[in-house]
Every structure is written in C-alpha cells, then in structure tokens.
Amino acid sequence: MRLPPLQAAKFIRRYKRFMADVELANGNILTIHCANTGAMTGCAEKGDTVWYSDSKSTTRKYPCSWELTELSNGNLVCINTHRSNQLVQEALQNKVIKELAGYSEIYPEVKYGEENSRIDFLLKGEGLPDCYVEVKSITLVKNNIGMFPDAVTTRGQKHVRELLAMKKQGYRAVVLFAGLHNGFDCFKTAEYIDPDYDKLLRQAMKEGVEVYAYAGKFDKIQEIPTALSLAEVVPLCFN
C-alpha cells in the first residue's frame, strides 16, 4: 500500500482524541488530525518522530493528518487505523494472505449478523463456503509481541460474537490481525487490558473461528516511509 507523501515532525501532545500538536524543523507548532481513537499505547511518546501527510485541503480545519510514528528504537507504526482495511484489501487481491487465497470475489463492508454489524470483507469463491473476515489493527507491541486491543473494546467483543454465530451456520469466520507495526514476531490478545475480549476470542477459536496475525513491513526511500504491506503470518503466542 502506497503511503501519501510524508513529512517529519516531533510529537508534543495528543488531545481531544482527534488532535495532536507537533513541532516542525523550524520550531513552529502545527496541529494535525489524529484518526486513531484508541489508547495508542507506546505510539505517542513526547519527542517521538511523527510522519504526517498534507491533504492541501482549503476546507478542512486541520488539513494535515498523523500517519506514522517512528519510535525511539527505530520501529514504525501506522497510527492511522483507517488504512488497515485498505492494506488488507490489497493483500487479499494480491493473494498475500495464503489462508484466504482461494477466494476470487471480495466484498467490503457487508451488513450481516444479529447485532447490526458490518463485516470488513465477505469473500466468495466457487465451491467454497462464504468467508467472513473481520480486520483488527496491531499497533500495541511489548517485548516483540504484537497485541490487541490497546483499550477495552465492546465493539470488538460484538464482532467476535457475530463471527461465532456465522461459523455455527456453516460459514468460514476469520479474525485477521493486521500488523501496522513492524516490531513484533508473534501475536496474542492483551488480556490484561480487555479480559472479556480475550475470553470471547479464545472460546470462538475453540469453536472454529480462525485467527491469523500478519506482520507489517515498511518500505523507505531516502529514509522516508513510502509504503506499508503485510509481510508474513506470525505465530500465535497465547498463554
């Protein structure tokens, strides 16, 4: 997935959920939009390098958007979680996700379930059961372990219940954890943050809901990030 042209700044603070102040190279302070409504644990430390895009819009109050954080250890994390579905759709189209490569038709944002949900992707293929794919973003990493969620997610819990119901109806049901961070080599739920989500997902896995986690890979040109892709599946390391 190609990233928009990016510029670097130093992170100062995040506030009102959707706003952040950054310091430019010339010392000026710029307020940028933050699309991530999560806790952003470990992704918003004062002094971190922020990579932002400029929409050049004359109508947006804050035309610049926070896209990536470059951490003190050099790892990159895409904090704009709106890009996760774009990333996964590209991977599905290019058959990068081997577990789902047999499907030829990809339908995004399809209504389904009994709790007024939308599935991120409904996959169809000749001779194959329909496959419901829910995408979750990995931005939280500790000790090289990718984790989800970074805050309590009642919405995520609902999605697991919906997927389990689809599995019981005979369809494939998949939770795909997409790496927006390039610093992990296995994945687990953050049970210390949301034990209910952890419990629900473990039970769903026992009943046939499939769970896959893919690492993220960033490309750079002259040290500027230019693209993000899903690299390879990583093992699950649940306790």
Curated annotation (Swiss-Prot):
Q: What domain of life is recorded for the organism?
A: Bacteria
Query: Record's InterPro entries?
Result: SfsA, SfsA_C, SfsA_N
Query: GO terms for molecular function, please?
Result: DNA binding
Q: Name one Pfam family in it.
A: SfsA_N
Annotated CDD domains: SfsA-like_bacterial
Gene3D superfamilies from the UniProt entry:
2.40.50.580, 3.40.1350.60
Disulfide pairings: none
Which family does the similarity line name?
A: Belongs to the SfsA family.
Q: Which HAMAP family match?
A: SfsA (MF_00095)
Q: What is this protein called?
A: Sugar fermentation stimulation protein homolog
Q: Which organism is it from?
A: Mannheimia succiniciproducens (strain KCTC 0769BP / MBEL55E)
